[in-house]
Amino acid sequence: MNNLTVIARENCIYCRLAIRLLEEKGLKFELLMLGVDFEREEFQSLAPGAKTFPQILVNGVSIGGYEDLLEKVDSIC
């Protein structure tokens, strides 16, 4: 089973879509919210090179954002 993490922020439609997709697929994941679980300064240490939200991590490695998740979700299951 893969370890999934969603790095998200409030008022982000793609963050909500990613969370909904994972929930609909019945996948368990850790949710890290900007301003609650980490601060903006920590974002790069969580997802090096990332510039947008959400960031989806599979086993600690970023696979990208929502569009990337859509392409890869079936292989993650």
Predicted regions and their residues:
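Non-catalytic interaction surface on structured domains
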Residues: 19, 28-30, 45, 71-76
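Short alpha-helical
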Residues: 13, 38, 64
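Structural micro-motif
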Residues: 47-57, 66-67
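Thioredoxin-like thiol-disulfide oxidoreductase module
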Residues: 33-50
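Non-catalytic, surface beta->alpha helical segment in thiol-disulfide oxidoreductase systems
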Residues: 58-77
